[in-house]
């Protein structure tokens, strides 16, 4: 089964019906990301250990007859430009001097997690989010999966490339500053 061809809601339904486990979903997308990310550079940070741990907890919940949520087991990506997940590194778009560790979960992640989604990593963004292209000195450019000769534009380019290449179902996208949310 090509999981990337399902909708997020369809995948969540399959997980809740115990047709596929959340752990299997994470393993599937880990393999897919490992095969495809090097050509587009959508991700700056991946944490499949955390994702598998969350998937095992969700699987246990479902196996005990509890509902996992509409997005049960659905992999999501968080944007490196914004605060994301407690304990994960933050570079604010690849700015070495601003490297920190997030001290709280983002609003997007809390909402996605409440529906059963599982964060697998952080996506590339331009430094401070202030460029029409997704490129920075720390991680380099992100390409569109449709033509790797082109840059995935704007501050959410890593998120957009990850979703459009079927590496995750949902990804945190940006703030609208100077109109680049639509590049």
Question: What do these predicted regions represent?
Answer:
Residues 181-183:
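Conserved small/polar residues in nucleotide/adenosyl-binding loops
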């Amino acid at each position: 089964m090509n999981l990337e061809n399902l909708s997020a809601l369809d995948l969540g339904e399959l997980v809740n019906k115990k047709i596929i486990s959340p752990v299997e979903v994470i393993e599937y997308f880990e393999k897919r990301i490992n095969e495809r990310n090097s050509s587009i550079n959508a991700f700056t940070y991946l944490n499949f250990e955390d994702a598998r741990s969350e998937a095992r907890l969700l699987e246990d919940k479902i196996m005990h007859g509890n509902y996992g949520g509409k997005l049960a087991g659905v992999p999501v990506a968080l944007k490196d430009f914004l605060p994301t997940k407690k304990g994960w590194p933050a570079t604010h778009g690849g700015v070495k001097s601003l490297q920190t560790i997030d001290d709280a979960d983002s609003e997007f992640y809390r909402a996605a997690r409440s529906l059963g989604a599982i964060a697998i990593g952080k996506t590339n963004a331009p430094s401070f989010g202030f460029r029409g292209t997704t490129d920075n000195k720390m991680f380099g450019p992100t390409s569109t999966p449709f033509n790797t000769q082109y840059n995935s534009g704007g501050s959410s380019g890593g998120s957009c490339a990850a979703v459009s290449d079927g590496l995750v179902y949902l990804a945190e996208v940006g703030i609208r500053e100077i109109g680049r949310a639509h590049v």
